[in-house]
Amino acid sequence: MDITQLLAFSTKNKASDLHLSAGLPPMIRVHGDIRRINVEALDHKQVHAMIYDIMNDAQRKHYEEFLEVDFSFEIEGLARFRVNAFNQNRGAAAAFRTIPSKILTLEQLNCPPIFAELALKPRGLVLVTGPTGSGKSTTLAAMVDHLNERSYGHVLTIEDPIEFVHESKKCLVNQREVGRMTLSFASALRSALREDPDAILVGEMRDLETIRLAMTAAETGHLVFGTLHTSSAAKTIDRIVDVFPSEEKDMVRAMLSESLVAVISQTLCKNKEGSGRIAAHEIMLGTPAVRNLIRENKVAQMYSAIQMGNGFGMQTLDQSLTDLVRRNQISNAEARSKSKIPENFPG
């Protein structure tokens, strides 16, 4: 099988990822589980040739120099794929993440109604967080698409690499890829403020300068969507503040308390039939009470504020899991495995 056939097989079997690793057969991840494809093991030369075939010259040069590279590419009529090519102890390797060619709607993703409201906010910082593979990009793509269909504005995305491709509908959408169309998230964000955007998507807020610029953009009247690899709203606030030196922390808390609109922390759960996965969400909104907790560094009290904030559209992860169990969408055992307080789901 060549790389196109392997990716077609992967997509047909609803796999989220395809893994190539010298010395082993290709493997796919289906509903969270890794499974081997029933073909012979690939050697280093085969894997190397497969990934070289889909790289451009700049990507090959980067791979040779740094021994790993991130990029995305599309197979017409099949899907887009986000690729990380690297080396391991048996030779060449690569991980391919499937990016559906069609952007799912917030309704198709079973997102709570508050997501649609957040996508249309005029300004502020909306963060979608969670571990790798938790569907952050899919959720953000749906939110941007919701905005694109309902508002006349300029949406600017900064990604590494570009994942979902947005057509300009009611909005003008410009997508920039780090490494190909801009040197870094920070340099693209600095330029963004002179490019007349209404909304900015920052694919990953991974360093101090990017976080500072994203908060500044939100503070100066832009809607900013961003992602972090944190597992809860409280940890997200801590992570942002901890990036800054001690003498700036109070100022950052003040900035964050003014600009934060929402933190959505999500995790994917296997559905009851075992035929797919569904997201559970912790949702924290920038209510006056939450803003005050951020300003006064009372992060430990955020869980209680979220618990009590149902009327505003807030929910804890356990409240989301309980709702999914009640609606018979996930099992009690699955909820227990994802919960931060497993004893809430006895059995």
Residue positions per predicted region:
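Short, flexible helix-loop junctions that flank or precede catalytic/ligand sites
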Residues: 1-347
